[in-house]
C-alpha cells in the first residue's frame, strides 16, 4: 500500500513536470512580408505544371524565410495571403493553382504521405518545411471542393473554390484549415463559405485563431474567436492595400490587437505599386515590431517575443466621455470626406486646446498641446457616426485627429503620409455605442508609436510622453456590428454615399 502510494505520487509529479516543460510562458513569433512573384496576365488558364512552377518560385522565397526564422529560434511563422500565387485571377484562371485541402481531423502529415488526398505538392512542401525546421508554418493557398450541380448551392462549374489559410505544426501535421468568410470585391475567383468557420488550435505557447484580411472588419469570425473561443493570438495572412488616414495596415492591425486584447501576427504582401506593405507583430499593450516600406521591392522577415497568454484589462469606452459636457461650437464645424464617409470636423486653431465635435449619437472630446503651431500645416478633429457603404458595408463610430493634406480644409481626410508637427500631449475619448473600439496613433512616414500612449480604463486614449515624430493620425475606430445591415439604412443615405464616391475620386481604394 505504502509503496503504491509513493509510486502514484512519483508518477503524478513526473506528469506535472512534463506538462510544465511543454508549456511556454513566451514564444518567438515571426512574420514574413513577401514580395510575391506574380503570374503573367492571361484570359485563359495556364497548365497545372506552369501554375506549379510559379508557386514553387514563391515557395523558394518562403522557404528562405522559414529556414531563417527557424534558425533564429522562432516557434511560428506567418506568411501572406496570396503569397504563393499572387493576385488578379478569374474563377477559371485560378483553378490550376488549387489543391483539395482536407479537414485537419484526418490526422495527416503531407510530408510523410503526400498522395493520400491526391496531388498535393504545395501542401507537401509546406508540411516538409514545417517538419524539417521544427516550426509552425502558416500559409495561404486555394482550396477546391467538388459539388453536385443539382445542389442549389453548388456553382455551375461543379466546384467550390476557397481562399484558404493552412497551418502545419512543427511535426508537419496539418492542424488548421480556414476558408475566408468575408470576400473582398474583386475576389470573384473564390466562394463564400455557407457558414463562418471558427478555426482554432492549441500549442504549448497558447491558443491560436486564424482569419484573413477583410475578415478583420467584421464580427465573424474575428471577434467571436476572441470573445467566445478565448484565443491568445491571431494569425493574419493579408494582402492589404493601405487606405490613409485611418486604415493603413500597421495602423489598424495594431489597433485591433490593442482593442481586442490579443497578440496579432500580420503578414502582408509586399507590392508598393499596389500600395501593399505593412506587416507586424503586435501585443495588446503595444506593437512589438512593424515594417512599412514603399521604396524597395524587397521582402522582410520580422521577429518578436510575445507572452503566450497576454493579459487584457477591460475598458469602459464611454465612462470618461459621457461625463464631459457636450457643447460643440457649431460655427467652427465643417464637413469633409474620409474614405467616402462625410465627417464633421473642427479645425485645431491654437497650439493647445480642448474641443468637442458631435455627429448623430457620437460626441468626441479632445485635449491636446502641439510642440508648435505651424502656419503651413492644418490639423482637424472629427467625428463620424454612420454606415460605410463603399467597398463593403459596415457601421462605424470614429473620433479622429488628423493632419490635412493642405491648408485647404476640404483636403482634411485625404491621404497624406508626411507631417512636421509633434504633439506634447493628447487625450481623446468618445461616447461610443460599442465596446469594440480600436485605438490608432500614426506618425509621419507611416510609423507607429510603441510605448508612447495607452488606453485608460475609462476609455481615454492618452499620451504617455511627447510623440517621437510628427503626427498623421490619432483616432478611436469603433465598430457597431449589429447595425451593419440595419433596416434604417435608407436608400437615400446609400445613394448619398454613392454620389460622394463618384464626386470625390474615380480611383478605387482597395483594402484587401
From Swiss-Prot:
Topology with respect to the bilayer: Lipid-anchor; GPI-anchor
Which keywords accompany this UniProt record?
Cell membrane, Glycoprotein, GPI-anchor, Hydrolase, Lipoprotein, Membrane, Signal
**Where does the record place the catalytic residues?**
81, 180, 213
Main location (coarse class): membrane
* Compartments, as annotated in UniProt: Cell membrane
The EC code for this enzyme is 3.5.1.92
Question: What InterPro entries does UniProt report for this protein, alphabetically?
Answer: Biotinidase-like_euk, Biotinidase/VNN, C-N_Hydrolase, C-N_Hydrolase_sf, Vanin_C
**Group of enzyme by EC:** hydrolase
**In which tissues or organs does this protein occur?**
Detected in kidney (at protein level). Ubiquitous.
Reaction(s) catalysed by this chain, per the record, are:
(R)-pantetheine + H2O = cysteamine + (R)-pantothenate
Which Gene Ontology cellular-component terms appear in the entry? extracellular space; membrane; plasma membrane; side of membrane
Against Gene3D superfamilies, the record matches this protein to: Carbon-nitrogen hydrolase
Q: How is it modified after translation?
A: N-glycosylated.
One GO BP on record is: pantothenate metabolic process
Carbohydrate attachment sites? 132, 148, 316, 354
Family, as annotated = Belongs to the carbon-nitrogen hydrolase superfamily. BTD/VNN family.
| Quaternary structure annotation from Swiss-Prot or TrEMBL | Monomer.
This molecule's function is given as:
Amidohydrolase that hydrolyzes specifically one of the carboamide linkages in D-pantetheine thus recycling pantothenic acid (vitamin B5) and releasing cysteamine.
State what protein this is by name. Answer: Pantetheinase
Q: Which species is the source of this protein? A: Mus musculus (Mouse)
Per the record, the gene is Vnn1
Amino acid at each position: 500500500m505504502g509503496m503504491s502510494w509513493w509510486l502514484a505520487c512519483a508518477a503524478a509529479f513526473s506528469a506535472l513536470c512534463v506538462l510544465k516543460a511543454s508549456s511556454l510562458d513566451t514564444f518567438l513569433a515571426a512574420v514574413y512580408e513577401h514580395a510575391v512573384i506574380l503570374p503573367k496576365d492571361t484570359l485563359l488558364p495556364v497548365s497545372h505544371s506552369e501554375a506549379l512552377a510559379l508557386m514553387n518560385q514563391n515557395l523558394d522565397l518562403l522557404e528562405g524565410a522559414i529556414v531563417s526564422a527557424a534558425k533564429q529560434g522562432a516557434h511560428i511563422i506567418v506568411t501572406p495571403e496570396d503569397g504563393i500565387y499572387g493576385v488578379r485571377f478569374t474563377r477559371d484562371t485560378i483553378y490550376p493553382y488549387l489543391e483539395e485541402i482536407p479537414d485537419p481531423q484526418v490526422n495527416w502529415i503531407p510530408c510523410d504521405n503526400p498522395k493520400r488526398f491526391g496531388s498535393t505538392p504545395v501542401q507537401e512542401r509546406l508540411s516538409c518545411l514545417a517538419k524539417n525546421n521544427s516550426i509552425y508554418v502558416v500559409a495561404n493557398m486555394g482550396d477546391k471542393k467538388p459539388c453536385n450541380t443539382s445542389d442549389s448551392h453548388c456553382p455551375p462549374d461543379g466546384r467550390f473554390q476557397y481562399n484558404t489559410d493552412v497551418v502545419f505544426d512543427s511535426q508537419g501535421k496539418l492542424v488548421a484549415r480556414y476558408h475566408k468568410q468575408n470576400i473582398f470585391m474583386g475576389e470573384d475567383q473564390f466562394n463564400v463559405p455557407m457558414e463562418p468557420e471558427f478555426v482554432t488550435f492549441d500549442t504549448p505557447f497558447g491558443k491560436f485563431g486564424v482569419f484573413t484580411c477583410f475578415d478583420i472588419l467584421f464580427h465573424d469570425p474575428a471577434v467571436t474567436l476572441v470573445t467566445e473561443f478565448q484565443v491568445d493570438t491571431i494569425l493574419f495572412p493579408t494582402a492589404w492595400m493601405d487606405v490613409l488616414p485611418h486604415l493603413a495596415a500597421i495602423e489598424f492591425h495594431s489597433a485591433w490587437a490593442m482593442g481586442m486584447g490579443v497578440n496579432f501576427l500580420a503578414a502582408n504582401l509586399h507590392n508598393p505599386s499596389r500600395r501593399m506593405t505593412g506587416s507586424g507583430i503586435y501585443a495588446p499593450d503595444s506593437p512589438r515590431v512593424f515594417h512599412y516600406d514603399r521604396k524597395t521591392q524587397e521582402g522582410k522577415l520580422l521577429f518578436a517575443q510575445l507572452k503566450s497568454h497576454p493579459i487584457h484589462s477591460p475598458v469602459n469606452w464611454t465612462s470618461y466621455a459621457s461625463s464631459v459636457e457636450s457643447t460643440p461650437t457649431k460655427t467652427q464645424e465643417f464637413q469633409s470626406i474620409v474614405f467616402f464617409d462625410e465627417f464633421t470636423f473642427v479645425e485645431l486653431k491654437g497650439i493647445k486646446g480642448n474641443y468637442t465635435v458631435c455627429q448623430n449619437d457620437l460626441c468626441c472630446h479632445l485635449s491636446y498641446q502641439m510642440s508648435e503651431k505651424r502656419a503651413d500645416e492644418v490639423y482637424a478633429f472629427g467625428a463620424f457616426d454612420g454606415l460605410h457603404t463603399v467597398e463593403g458595408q459596415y457601421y462605424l463610430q470614429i473620433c479622429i485627429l488628423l493632419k490635412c493634406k493642405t491648408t485647404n480644409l476640404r483636403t482634411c481626410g485625404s491621404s497624406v503620409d508626411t507631417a512636421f508637427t509633434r504633439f506634447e500631449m493628447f487625450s481623446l475619448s468618445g461616447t461610443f455605442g460599442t465596446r469594440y473600439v480600436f485605438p490608432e496613433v500614426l506618425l509621419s512616414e507611416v510609423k507607429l508609436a510603441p510605448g508612447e500612449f495607452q488606453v485608460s480604463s475609462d476609455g481615454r486614449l492618452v499620451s504617455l510622453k511627447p510623440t517621437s515624430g510628427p503626427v498623421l493620425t490619432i483616432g478611436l475606430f469603433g465598430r457597431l456590428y449589429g447595425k451593419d445591415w440595419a433596416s434604417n439604412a435608407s436608400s437615400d443615405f446609400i445613394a448619398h454615399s454613392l454620389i460622394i464616391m463618384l464626386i470625390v475620386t474615380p480611383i478605387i481604394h482597395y483594402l484587401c
